Amino acid sequence: MAQFYSAKRRTTTRQIITVSVNDLDSFGQGVARHNGKTLFIPGLLPQENAEVTVTEDKKQYARAKVVRRLSDSPERETPRCPHFGVCGGCQQQHASVDLQQRSKSAALARLMKHEVSEVIADVPWGYRRRARLSLNYLPKTQQLQMGFRKAGSSDIVDVKQCPILVPQLEALLPKVRACLGSLQAMRHLGHVELVQATSGTLMILRHTAPLSSADREKLECFSHSEGLDLYLAPDSEILETVSGEMPWYDSNGLRLTFSPRDFIQVNAGVNQKMVARALEWLDVEPEDRVLDLFCGMGNFTLPLATQAASVVGVEGVPALVEKGQQNARLNGLQNVTFYHENLEEDVTKQPWAKNGFDKVLLDPARAGAAGVMQQIIKLEPIRIVYVSCNPATLARDSEALLKAGYTIARLAMLDMFPHTGHLESMVLFSRVK
C-alpha cells in the first residue's frame, strides 16, 4: 500500500547583516547601502550602525528590519507618544525636528532639481486641530476601542493620548472615550471626529443605527458640560446639528466659516504662515487681477482679495463655491467672485477670464493639476504660486511651466505634519522676460 507523507515545511533563516545608515528618507526610514543596493530600514537614523534582516528584496532596492541597534545618532530623540511605533499616525518621533526638516527638504530638492530656499514651520507638538478616531466594540470585553489604525493594518490602536493634537483635543480624549463607552449604541458607532476651530470645539459622531432617546440625552449633556458643538452623522450624507452655531476659524485677519465636514488645513500655525508667504511671493499690487484655482472655500482667495483689485476663485465642488461666496460677504469683500467649474476643461474661454490675470495661485489635491497647466500658460501670468501636498505630482506639473519659459524663483518645504512622512511644499514660478 502506498503511503504519502506531507513534505516538511521549508524553513529559512534570515541572514543578519550589519549596516551603517547614511541618510533619512522623507518617510522617516533609514537609508543604507549593502552589496551595491539601497536598503530602507524603519527606525534607524543617519550615523547609526545596526544588525538587520532583509524583509523584502527587489531588483533596485531592499527593505530590512532592525534586530539590534549598535550605536545611536546624536539626533535620536525619545518619542513623546507611548503609542509610537505601533500607531500608524507618526513615523518620525525618534528623530529631531531639525533632522526631519532637513531630510524632507533634501527629498524635495532632489525631486524638483532646485534648492529649497526656506522651511515654513510652526510648533512641532500640539499642532493638529482635527482628528478622526476609529471606534470598535469588542464583544468579549464589552469595551469600546477608540483610536487610530496600526501601521500597515486595519486594526485599531487604543489611544489614550496624542501629543500632536492641540492641547484642547488631547485633553478631551479620555472624556470622549468615557461618554461613548456608556452609550447603548456602543456596538453601532463608526468613528468620531474632533475639530478645534477658533469658534470652539466640534464633535462629529458617525453612528450606524438610530440612537435611543437616552443616548441622545447623554450626548447632549456631554456636549453642554464640555462646551462642544455636537453633530450626528447617521450616514455619509446626513449631518444633524444637535448644538452649536456655524463654526469658523481665523485666516490672516479674516473669519472663514466652514461645515464640520469641509476640508480645512489641520495645522493652523503653518496655514497662517503659508498664506502670508504666498501673498508675499505673488507680490500682489492694488491693480492686479488674481486667479485662485482649486480655491476651496477661500483660504487663499479671501486674503488675496484684501490686496488685489479683483480675485476670481475657481473650485470643482459646488458646496465649497457657495461657502466661499458666503465668506466673502461675511468679510465685506466685494472684489472677489467664486465660480464652479470643471477644471479638466478649458476655463480660459469663460467670460470671467477674458481680461486675463496678472498672478495665479493653485492648491490642488494629491492628484495634482496636469489638466490645468496648459490653461495657466495660456493666461501668461507674471507669477504663479503652486501649493502642493504631493511632491511627485508637483514635479510632473512643473515641467510644463519650465518648458513654457517659467523658472523656479522660490521653493519652500511646508512642515505641515511634523513627525510624519507627509511632505508638503510651495513653489514660486516667474516668467522669463
UniProtKB/Swiss-Prot annotation:
Some GO term, biological process aspect, for this entry: which one?
Answer: rRNA base methylation
Reactions it catalyzes: uridine(1939) in 23S rRNA + S-adenosyl-L-methionine = 5-methyluridine(1939) in 23S rRNA + S-adenosyl-L-homocysteine + H(+)
GO molecular function (one): RNA binding
> Which residue positions are annotated as catalytic?
C389
Q: What is its EC number?
A: 2.1.1.190
What is its biological role? Answer: Catalyzes the formation of 5-methyl-uridine at position 1939 (m5U1939) in 23S rRNA.
Species this chain originates from: Escherichia coli O6:H1 (strain CFT073 / ATCC 700928 / UPEC)
Broad EC category: transferase
Q: Where does S-adenosyl-L-methionine bind?
A: Q265, F294, N299, E315, N342, D363
Please report the name of this protein according to its UniProt entry. Answer: 23S rRNA (uracil(1939)-C(5))-methyltransferase RlmD
What's the gene? rlmD
Q: Which family does it belong to?
A: Belongs to the class I-like SAM-binding methyltransferase superfamily. RNA M5U methyltransferase family. RlmD subfamily.
Q: Where are the transmembrane segments?
A: none
**Where in the numbering of this chain does the TRAM domain appear?**
10-68
Which keywords has UniProt assigned to this entry? 4Fe-4S, Iron, Iron-sulfur, Metal-binding, Methyltransferase, rRNA processing, S-adenosyl-L-methionine, Transferase
Q: Which Gene3D superfamilies match?
A: 2.40.50.1070, Nucleic acid-binding proteins (2.40.50.140), Vaccinia Virus protein VP39 (3.40.50.150)
Residues holding [4Fe-4S] cluster: C81, C87, C90, C162
Under the heading SUPFAM superfamilies, the entry gives:
Nucleic acid-binding proteins, S-adenosyl-L-methionine-dependent methyltransferases
